[in-house]
Regions:
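Extracellular, repeat-based ectodomains that mediate carbohydrate processing or recognition
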Residues: 1-172
Length: 172
């Protein structure tokens, strides 16, 4: 087992996701800061054998002031098809978290534009047009069914003590 360089602990603590595609290609997603306690970006790395890994590639929005956390990763039906979800506060404050989605069809060389999944500004007292107050990132999952449909569920709420809710969406 090897430590991933650049995966220093920040405020949100480390979290990582792993998926293996139909050809055995391995991808990991994780968040890391440039220094301990700094806002963290979302990165991916991939490997054909689990022994050698590509350099990390940033897949979040590139800002040094945005917190990114809690990745979820799933493999699609074809080699190189991976789907990534995570939560970040790019909409301006720590009370404006959202759940984001990106997809690659070529093993991570290129990615779709980030799609905001948590785009409902109502339905709960902790939601605004900008996002939700607090991410329950340890309650985030992504799966791909036999037809290639992506399914995502996540938790969000008012604070780490609640109340909160679970939200679900699906799509290609």
């Amino acid at each position: 087992m090897n430590q991933i360089p650049g995966s220093d602990v920040g405020f949100l603590g480390p979290s990582v996701a792993l998926a293996v595609d139909s050809a055995g290609g391995i991808m990991i997603a994780y968040h890391a800061g440039d220094s301990p306690g700094a806002p963290q970006k979302m990165y991916i790395r991939d490997s054909a054998d689990g022994l050698t890994w590509t350099e990390r590639m940033e897949v979040s929005n590139g800002s040094f002031t945005v917190n990114n956390a809690f990745p979820g990763l799933a493999a699609g039906r074809t080699p190189g098809d991976f789907r990534l979800v995570w939560q970040d506060d790019r909409n301006g404050s720590t009370n404006a978290w959202n759940t984001w989605y990106r997809r690659t069809a070529n093993g991570g060389r290129t990615w779709s534009q980030a799609l905001r999944l948590s785009d409902l500004g109502e339905g709960a007292p902790y939601k605004t047009e900008a996002g939700y107050f607090f991410p329950y990132g340890d309650y985030l999952e992504i799966a791909v069914d036999g037809k290639g449909m992506t399914h995502v569920i996540w938790g969000e709420g008012l604070s780490y003590t609640g109340p909160g809710g679970s939200w679900y969406t699906r799509g290609r």
